[in-house]
């Protein structure tokens, strides 16, 4: 009887989710209640985790808790440490949940709410969550090896070396971009800097408490950490109000860049239980807490989505970013649905912490479900704003101008009527001097969150506090991806160096670890620092590559798992990774090609293509006599040239992995030839 009731409940959830999604898709009014989205997502994510992740875990991957994980076999107290699955979940979620799920969906909102909702919900359940889960599985069956090293083992030395170089390049770009977002959020913000700084001693206290004083007492240390975190947040507010204290905790962007480099270096070489894992777990409290409160607040307030279902900008003519809905919406949403960066964490720090194989389901699939929820909440924060206000915040200065009246006039001409007074009122309510062209997604999320709180409390004076709290939240949200990313990149560099000089590949060696970490931090730190002193240089040169390279990385990771499953003889099961791989690689190859096509009569394609931009800039250089303008054009030409070259390189790497994957899978299926042989570590039974 009880089993039948449970089955009926799941059937009801499926029907309810389908109805809510149908309402979102077919609604024709000017606005729609966000509750439809909340209910639809709750049903779809619950069904996906309960049934699809279970099917993958026990029918395809066949997880075995009697098989010892790398953390148990190689327990060294530093990198390989068996860790409670709640802590591991906290670490993994904190590490993967960077800027992407907050920024991508907000930018994609320029095309309307429906395309992003469908891609986030369906794409994450069938693609992104699967991607994180299966890569984590592959790594724990290969002694916690990195993605590049696994490609080398399963596809051959040459392919592995080329792929590792490409993956490392993508990784350094991603870390530098994430670090720059943190720098921009904390620059000249004593409240934000103080709170972020305090999470370090709090995390160390938690690590020592669990390691030496009260091992396995997760609830105790959770309560202690949460209370101290709340105290730090409130103390940060008073620090910012005291002129003397505020001056101590106020830093410019360049100083913060050096500090983040130092923090990334130290966090990467210290034992994982001492700082990285407890700090990520602590950050997860705030991340999940804020998102959870935001979901409850949305249910309570039930604000309408004011952004249209589909806007005229699906053709690629929008001011926020260039490119049509296919393929550039998928590239822009990025981490909210699927992210190659996650594959690096799933084959970096996390597989070295899992205490048993079944934990991979919650940690891999479950963490990505949570990140996808974050992406939807970010989309809601953008969608509940007046469309005119959304475009005022996210459109570049070159499109709307510097003056509020001019901006209001331009945006109204796009069909989203807004007055200068409405823009000024919002600017005043959040305590900023201007909200025009505050691109990047973070201010939009912060304003949306502040508006939801305002609707609950009914007092516009609270908006300034919650706006700045949200900016702080985003900085904490992203910094955890920087430290975990640096540690993961250190593993990748050691894998590469080990091919040249074997002792450098020894993960247990402190000297080798310090050397590899130094190379890693110098790699991403250079681009970060240059970006703080040159608004068109450093990481800003490589920023346009983030979306394409990140998704290309996800495609390569899915190909690896497909090869592994084919070698294991699980041909039908391999479709869980093969089908998403085909879709993601189709999207990324198409978008990559569009980024390097020559100049044409299509203005949208010209805005997207680096090669077309080089041709346009070259024509301008020939007509320019002003020395300052000439230097600016030459710098822009150089940036586009670098982006075009790297885009082609990343596509060639992905194409090489694709060709070899098809060959290996074909031989396994049609000829029963397994070469290179399956590289699983020998079975060791848990003692």
Regions found by a protein language model. Give the residues of each.
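Membrane-interface "cap" regions at the ends of multi-pass membrane proteins
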Residues: 1-14, 47-102, 284, 324, ...
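Transmembrane helix-loop junctions in multi-pass membrane proteins
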Residues: 18-31, 102, 114, 172-188, ...
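Membrane-interface helix-loop-helix modules in multi-pass membrane proteins
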Residues: 22-28, 32-33, 80-142, 153-157, ...
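Extracellular loop-to-transmembrane helix junctions
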Residues: 31-50, 108-138, 148, 193-203, ...
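Membrane-interface loop-to-helix entry segments
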Residues: 35-43, 47-60, 166, 190-233, ...
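Flexible loop linkers connecting adjacent transmembrane helices
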Residues: 53-81, 107, 121, 130-159, ...
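Loop-to-transmembrane helix boundary motifs in multi-pass membrane proteins
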Residues: 154-172, 366-373, 439-441, 460-470, ...
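Extracellular/periplasmic helix-exit of transmembrane alpha-helices
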Residues: 298-314, 369-447, 484, 529-537
